[in-house]
């Protein structure tokens, strides 16, 4: 399985919140625990419906949060046409972090 981007790993390992709200997309995020990520990636069949992406959480509204090979962040509906419905929401995890709000 491909590696998670360094900025994402730094965020998670620093003890920052594993859920929160953002201005703009994703609006809300819930990150998968690192020790559960590979199992959840398999359980959600990410390799089957979104090949080339690394699942790492959801927006709480039926969409997977995933990285592509460049580290860009995408939202992909759990029900739909997989990669054809993938929507790029940030060039990197740090861009999502910059949008985190208190509400």
Task: List each language-model region with its residue ranges.
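Compact, glycine/acidic-enriched structural inserts
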Residues: 82-103
């Amino acid at each position: 399985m491909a590696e998670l981007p360094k900025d994402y790993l730094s965020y998670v390992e620093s003890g920052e919140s594993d859920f929160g709200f953002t201005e703009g997309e994703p609006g809300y995020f819930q990150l998968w625990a690192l020790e559960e990520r590979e199992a959840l990636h398999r359980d959600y069949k990410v390799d089957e419906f979104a090949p080339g992406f690394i699942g790492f959480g959801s927006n709480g509204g039926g969409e997977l949060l995933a990285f592509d090979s460049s580290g860009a962040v995408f939202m992909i509906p759990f029900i739909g046409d997989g990669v054809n419905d993938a929507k790029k929401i940030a060039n990197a995890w740090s861009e999502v972090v910059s949008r985190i709000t208190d509400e």
